[in-house]
């Protein structure tokens, strides 16, 4: 299976002169959804920044292998003067999407996430949930080879969560790779093919759910139970 992303992070980021992240190595393959999980402050966001080329004091190597990608950040951000539709039109222009195809994709996504009625309004006035849905729409619009997603479930209602998960599954089937950072382990357990667990700035556990269960000695138990045992005990 083709690797879309190969990340070798020897070190990245500093807090009070201390390295935030050391010796994290991960890869994402075509048609695969990979979960990046860890406690608050473990170094997940620093890993994402390093992968995107935004981390200070980075040492290592990031290989995208000629693939396009879309980034969905944890905190939505929009141009104050642009409407929802103008945001989508800008993305379409940047990615060279033909006008007819853009209109079809945009309208379909707006209907899926129930934002069609506000497409000519300013996103900066939207609720957190509506802004989060627009961030998802912007990423899905370009149909990239890979997605890097940071805490996507924050602010989403149950219906939007279900539709988002369905979209991820469809993109996987299309062949897209997905790296998703999340605290929502019950959902991650159901949809992720593999996991990378970061604790105290280092990669300490990785593999499929079965691998994680075997390494923690919790056969048949939930990802949350395995994660709790792993971070509370010795590194495995």
UniProtKB/Swiss-Prot annotation:
Its EC number is 7.-.-.-. InterPro entries: AAA+_ATPase (IPR003593), ABC_transporter-like_ATP-bd (IPR003439), ABC_transporter-like_CS (IPR017871), ABC_Transporter_VariousFunc (IPR051782), P-loop_NTPase (IPR027417). It comes from the Bacteria. Pfam families: ABC_tran. ATP binds at residues 38-45. One of its GO terms (molecular function) is ATP hydrolysis activity. Residues 4-225 form the ABC transporter domain. Keywords: ATP-binding, Nucleotide-binding, Translocase, Transport. Belongs to the ABC transporter superfamily. This is Uncharacterized ABC transporter ATP-binding protein YthP. The gene is ythP.
């Amino acid at each position: 299976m083709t690797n879309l992303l190969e990340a070798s992070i020897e070190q990245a980021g500093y807090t009070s002169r201390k390295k935030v992240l050391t010796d994290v190595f991960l890869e994402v393959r075509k048609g695969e959804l990979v979960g990046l999980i860890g406690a608050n402050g473990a170094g997940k966001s620093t890993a994402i920044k390093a992968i995107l080329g935004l981390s200070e004091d980075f040492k290592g190597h990031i290989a995208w292998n000629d693939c396009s990608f879309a980034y969905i950040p944890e905190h939505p951000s929009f141009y104050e003067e642009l409407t929802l539709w103008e945001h989508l039109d800008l993305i379409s222009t940047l990615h060279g999407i033909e006008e007819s195809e853009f209109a079809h994709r945009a309208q379909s996504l707006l209907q899926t996430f129930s934002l069609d009625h506000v497409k000519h309004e300013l996103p900066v006035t939207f609720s957190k949930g509506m802004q989060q849905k627009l961030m998802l729409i912007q990423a899905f619009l370009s149909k990239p080879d890979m997605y890097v997603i940071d805490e996507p479930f924050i602010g989403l209602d149950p219906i939007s969560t279900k539709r988002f998960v369905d979209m991820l599954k469809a993109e996987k089937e299309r062949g897209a790779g997905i790296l998703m950072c999340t605290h929502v382990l019950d959902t991650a357990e159901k949809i992720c093919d593999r996991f990378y667990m970061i604790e105290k700035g280092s990669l300490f556990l990785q593999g499929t759910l079965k691998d994680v269960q075997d390494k923690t000695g919790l056969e048949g138990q939930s990802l949350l139970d395995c994660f709790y045992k792993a971070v509370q005990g010795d590194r495995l």
